[in-house]
């Protein structure tokens, strides 16, 4: 089965389980396509949100940086390099490292966050991190139940200015985040 058919099957199953998602089925597929393209091109995902959405950001990153449902092995070329550098340690690393989809949560930097809140404009903390970490072709995922969280909106604008793609995960049909 080709990837597109598999994706559609998964999306249909998702909508079957959660019928409220029917109206955003095309958006889910578009978000997948953005992420697939970014990862295929060696890019990364930056994720931010507030409160419960911050927890979601951390969880998403955790699942991408290690196996989720299926094992993701590291590439054989990396295994060869590991063993060449140090046979014993390289073998342990080769046996236990997991393939990762590069992702960074912007909510888990207490030193930067508190310094920025003390010395700069607190609402710009995610935008500052996007500015420092983001590169053209990367993806910014802003999670906001309302879709109107100012710090997430500023980060989306910063992301667009640097050539990142922006995905908004919101709970509201109409919101400010959808314009980015």
Predicted regions located by residue number:
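A short, well-structured juxtamembrane/interface segment
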Residues: 22-41
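Glycine-rich, small/polar surface segments that engage phosphate groups of diverse ligands
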Residues: 39-133
């Amino acid at each position: 089965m080709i990837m597109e058919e598999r994706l559609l099957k998964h999306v249909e199953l998702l909508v079957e389980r959660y019928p409220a998602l029917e109206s955003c089925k095309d958006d889910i597929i578009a978000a997948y396509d953005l992420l697939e393209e970014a990862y295929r091109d060696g890019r990364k995902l930056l994720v931010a949100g507030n409160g419960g959405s911050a927890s979601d950001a951390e969880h998403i990153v955790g699942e991408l940086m290690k196996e989720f449902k299926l094992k993701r092995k590291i590439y054989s070329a990396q295994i060869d390099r590991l063993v060449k550098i140090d046979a014993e340690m390289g073998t342990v690393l080769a046996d236990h490292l997991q393939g990762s989809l590069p992702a960074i949560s912007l909510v888990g930097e207490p030193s930067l966050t508190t310094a920025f809140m003390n010395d700069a404009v607190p609402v710009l903390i995610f935008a500052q991190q996007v500015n420092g970490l983001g590169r053209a072709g990367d993806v910014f995922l802003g999670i906001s139940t309302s879709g109107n969280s100012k710090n997430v909106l500023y980060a989306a604008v910063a992301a667009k200015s640097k050539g990142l793609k922006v995905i908004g995960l919101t709970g509201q049909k109409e919101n400010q985040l959808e314009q980015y």
